[in-house]
Design a protein with these regions (language model features):
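Acidic, glycine- and Ser/Thr-rich low-complexity intrinsically disordered tracts
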Residues: 2-9, 371-372, 377, 383, ...
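Short glycine/acidic-rich loop motifs that flank beta-strands on beta-rich extracellular proteins
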Residues: 61-62, 73-76, 90, 95-97, ...
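The right-handed parallel beta-helix/beta-solenoid scaffold, focusing on the short coil/turn
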Residues: 62, 69, 75, 81-83, ...
């Protein structure tokens, strides 16, 4: 048997049952349009959009064209494999409706598929909801995202069982919170040329481990291109345990959480030519993000750090970015609980890092037992007064850090090496 590298190349493939690798390049694929008029599915809410996604997915994939208009969502649009969402840029706006919140009026056990609300006013069948409770054993927060599918008065059936106990003693609540686009266990999806608005002034917070303008979990080969993700009370774009995600030419701004959140376990993300502005953190590498690339992005005015790298985020390249006006730190290597948990073998190269933090701000801060880091050809500049500002700070526990050809201007201390000699 020939080794894989000598296998003959695939030419002129045919559509073959079960073959998800080699597919003919068809001249035309199924396309369904959604809009307020002159569309195959007429409507401007989540139900119309979901109907289009489900129709296209049932036939093996294709494109959902979102025509110009404002689409008001009472539930997430759940994506499906091999479906492309194609909007009309700034003219196609998916807007989250204001959130409601109430306590649960009766206990629900982990095997139950229903809840009882203390005040059901404003809640309706079809709504997406987020249930939260304190675990009675350890006090931790439990979260479940569900859809209301039937009701009798204040009692609502859920689309799935709870799988956690939601008891009154845990201060259990129900809120109409959800991502705008949601995807779990799907692959080969494109979201393109569309505007997503989280309506943060009228919604409570739901963090990026559960939601965002886009929230993805356990997915493969996802592309987000020319997506504007704004005003979410949480993250802009968040993907957890998702591999080979491409985010390019997107604009994530004015979210209360993270602009772009390559989440835990995500392998090989490519984040290119985007803008992340006025978020809490511009690009946040979560836990165990490896072999990623963040290049040619503009990260401006983020309240905490421009780029944050931490728990076992190894072998990533952050290069040719403009990281401007960060609230605390330009690029942060987070302190973790030991060397085995720290981020290693990452490269920060050829970035322009300008005006980082307050009077004691730091452009590049290497904390914890981070090791085998390369800081190369970065331009670090401070246009305000030097104050106590630092260009590059190496923490006391930092390991090997290679620094070469960095240009540092306008700070009080160019390099603060706190390691023991």
């Amino acid at each position: 048997m020939l080794p894989a590298e000598e296998r003959p190349a695939v030419t002129h493939p045919r559509a073959t049952s079960g073959d998800t690798v080699a597919e003919p390049n068809w001249d035309e694929r199924l396309t369904i349009s959604v809009g307020s008029r002159d569309a195959e599915i007429v409507g401007t809410n989540d139900r119309a959009l979901q109907a289009a996604v489900d129709y296209v997915a049932r036939l093996g994939g294709g494109t959902v064209r979102v025509l110009p208009g404002v689409y008001r969502l009472r539930n997430a649009v759940y994506l499906a494999s091999s479906v492309r969402i194609l909007g009309s840029g700034a003219d196609s706006i998916l807007m989250k409706e204001p959130s409601l919140k109430t306590k649960l009026a009766a206990d629900s056990d982990w095997f139950d598929q229903e809840i009882t609300l203390a005040d059901a006013k404003g809640f309706a069948v079809g709504d997406g909801v987020c249930l939260r409770t304190k675990n009675p054993h350890n006090g931790g927060m439990e979260v479940a995202k569900r859809t209301l599918v039937a009701r009798s008065g204040n009692r609502f059936k859920l689309d799935r069982a709870l799988r956690q106990n939601f008891w009154e003693m845990g201060d259990s609540t129900c809120a109409s919170l959800f991502p705008i686009f949601s995807g779990e266990n799907i692959a080969d999806v494109v979201i393109e040329n569309i505007t997503l608005d989280g309506n943060k002034d009228n919604n409570e917070n739901l963090d990026g481990n559960y939601a965002g303008c886009v929230f993805l979990q356990d997915c493969n080969r996802i592309t987000m291109r020319q997506v504007e993700a704004r005003n979410y009370n949480g993250d802009g774009l968040s993907w957890q345990i998702c591999h080979d995600v491409l985010v390019e030419n997107c604009f994530s701004h004015d979210n209360t959480g993270l602009g772009m959140h390559p989440g835990s376990g995500s392998q090989r993300p490519v984040i290119r030519n985007n803008r992340s502005e006025r978020n809490d953190i511009g690009i946040f590498f979560c836990w165990g993000v490896k072999f990623g690339l963040a290049e040619k992005n503009k990260i401006d005015g983020c309240r905490s750090s421009g780029v944050s790298i931490g728990h076992r985020d190894n072998n990533n390249l952050v290069c040719d970015n403009d990281i401007l006006n960060s609230g605390k730190v330009g690029v942060l290597f987070r302190p973790e609980r030991g060397k085995a948990f720290a981020p290693h073998r990452n490269r920060i190269e050829n970035n322009r890092i300008v005006d980082s933090g307050p009077a004691d701000g730091v452009a590049i801060d290497v904390q914890g037992e981070t090791d085998a880091i390369v800081l190369s050809r970065n331009q670090i500049r401070e246009s305000r007064q030097p104050m106590q500002r630092v260009g590059i700070r190496l923490g006391a526990q930092a390991g090997q850090v290679e620094m070469k050809e960095n240009k540092i201007d306008g700070v009080s201390v160019a390099v603060a090496d706190l390691r023991k000699s």
